[in-house]
């Protein structure tokens, strides 16, 4: 229930966010008399020369993948030990059985690979399927007594079905995936309160309170059940909202990264599914299945030094032809996400990359009705916005994507400031034509930026290359 509510709410919020973004981008801010005469632009402070090192990036990528894979195995083995102790029976505990079951329980490792590598959901599901086939072979080989193939398949399928369905609901659609992980704690808490209330009411169905009888008599059975299910929301709405806002503030304070937040959320779902299936058999002892989740914050703290990048980080400016959503999103997944292991990424905000760049702080800024505060209205605000960029690495060693929200009347000032800050520029010119005046202006600015170490232009068959090269 909580997942379905999260998916529905995320669909609505994402659509409203996109609509609000478009409206603000097209709007011109009222003139500010205080900015009628532009102050002289102060020279940018000198920064260390950044080094572009593709080999270091590949090493960081493999180091990161090894870290999250080892973490998944650690969680899986811990879960298997606890399951053998408190769910299946302590007499079954042995080193071999714990390791085998731990490898099976570590199946979210394949989901983590998809998150790190930014695979499509189809490819991620394929990886999960291959992992489960390997685990099927392992369990058949390690089984003390021969088990029918259908029994083993049913057990493995039951282990992953609920978590995979949940992750598909909140992650398969880009529109939902952009917002759902940050609304999930709110709606899980509300849904849990509804389920608990209905269970308490069901336990007293033989002797219900008088007010319940009167409520059913006044509005009917199903409306009464609905009222009792939703009533706890009135009490928990503010605490749930406060918890979500606390998470947003923690993200802003760099307590965790966006990727580790998703990793923690998906592992919580996987462990929760195991706990729910064991709840009826062993009662509250099934909650011990959540204990392995604590390895995630511990690992995030312990791996900070090992995953930390070294040297001065280069800054990548991403420019693109707007309204080419699918293509630029794929480019973001394949290039920018890997670049984040080496340096910062800056860009002018747009709705085309909403599903890739939105973070908890963005979501709750919008829900508080303060999205317009993010937009820069004049050159002074551009400089202020750039000073507020978060250019330090997250605890997992990855750098964040910083966006400059611009009106139609301020994007050129923002572009000049971003180009001055950048070391490298990636400009996606697929679909570019002579009528794309904004891109032509950007090419003209790049032509005069002699400090850039590298400018990469991406073409395809639909690109008007002659116009682009002439402008450059």
Where do the PLM segments sit?
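Glycine-rich, charge-decorated loop segments at or immediately adjacent to ligand/cofactor-binding or catalytic sites
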Residues: 356-363, 458-472
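N-terminal topogenic membrane-targeting module
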Residues: 32-48, 257-270, 280-394, 398
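Transmembrane alpha-helical segments of multi-pass membrane proteins
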Residues: 56-73, 121-137, 178-195, 251-272
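Hydrophobic cores of alpha-helical transmembrane segments in multi-pass inner/ER membrane proteins
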Residues: 4-11, 100-111, 155-168, 227-241, ...
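Acidic/glycine-enriched connector segments
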Residues: 87, 91-98, 142-149, 365-422
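Cytoplasmic membrane-interface regions of multi-pass membrane proteins
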Residues: 16-56, 105-127, 161-184, 238-258
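Conserved TIR/SEFIR loop-to-helix hotspot centered on a Trp-containing motif
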Residues: 432-445
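Membrane-helix interface and helix-disruption motif detector
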Residues: 1, 80-101, 116-122, 138-158, ...
């Amino acid at each position: 229930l909580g997942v379905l509510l999260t998916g529905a709410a995320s669909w609505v919020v994402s659509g409203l966010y996109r609509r609000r973004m478009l409206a603000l981008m097209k709007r011109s801010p009222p003139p500010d008399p205080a900015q009628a005469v532009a102050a002289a632009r102060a020279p940018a402070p000198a920064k260390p020369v950044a080094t572009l090192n593709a080999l270091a990036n590949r090493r960081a990528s493999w180091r990161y993948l090894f870290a999250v894979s080892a973490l998944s195995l650690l969680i899986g083995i811990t879960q298997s030990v606890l399951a053998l102790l408190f769910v299946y029976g302590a007499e079954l505990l042995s080193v071999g059985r714990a390791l085998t079951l731990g490898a099976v329980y570590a199946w979210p490792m394949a989901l983590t690979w998809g998150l790190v590598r930014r695979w499509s959901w189809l490819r991620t599901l394929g990886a999960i399927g291959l992992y489960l086939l390997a685990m099927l072979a392992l369990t058949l080989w390690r089984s003390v007594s021969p088990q029918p193939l259908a029994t083993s398949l049913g057990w493995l399928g039951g282990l992953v079905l609920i978590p995979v369905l949940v992750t598909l609901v909140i992650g398969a659609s880009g529109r939902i995936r952009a917002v759902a992980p940050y609304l999930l704690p709110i709606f899980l808490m509300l849904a849990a309160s509804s389920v608990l209330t209905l269970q308490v009411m069901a336990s007293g169905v033989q002797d219900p309170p008088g007010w319940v009888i009167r409520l059913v008599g006044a509005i009917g059975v199903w409306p009464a059940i609905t009222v009792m299910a939703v009533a706890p929301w009135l009490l928990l709405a503010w605490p749930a909202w406060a918890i979500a806002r606390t998470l947003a503030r923690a993200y802003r304070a760099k307590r965790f990264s966006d990727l580790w937040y998703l990793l923690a959320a998906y592992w919580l779902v996987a462990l929760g599914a195991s706990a729910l299936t064991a709840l009826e058999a062993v009662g509250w002892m099934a909650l011990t299945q959540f204990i392995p989740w604590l390895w995630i914050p511990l690992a995030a703290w312990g791996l900070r030094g090992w995953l930390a990048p070294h040297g001065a980080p280069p800054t990548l400016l991403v420019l693109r032809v707007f309204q080419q959503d699918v293509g630029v999103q794929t480019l973001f997944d394949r290039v920018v996400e890997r670049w984040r292991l080496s340096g910062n990424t800056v860009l002018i905000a747009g709705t085309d990359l909403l599903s890739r760049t939105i973070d908890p702080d963005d979501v709750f800024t919008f829900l508080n009705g303060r999205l317009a505060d993010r937009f820069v209205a004049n050159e002074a605000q551009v400089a202020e916005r750039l000073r507020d960029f978060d250019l330090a690495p997250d605890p997992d060693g990855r750098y964040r994507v910083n966006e400059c929200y611009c009106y139609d009347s301020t994007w050129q000032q923002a572009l000049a400031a971003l180009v001055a800050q950048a070391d490298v520029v990636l400009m996606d010119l697929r679909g570019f034509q002579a009528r794309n005046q904004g891109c032509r202006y950007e090419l003209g600015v790049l032509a005069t930026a002699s400090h850039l170490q590298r400018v990469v232009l991406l073409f395809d068959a639909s690109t008007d290359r002659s116009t682009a090269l002439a402008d450059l």
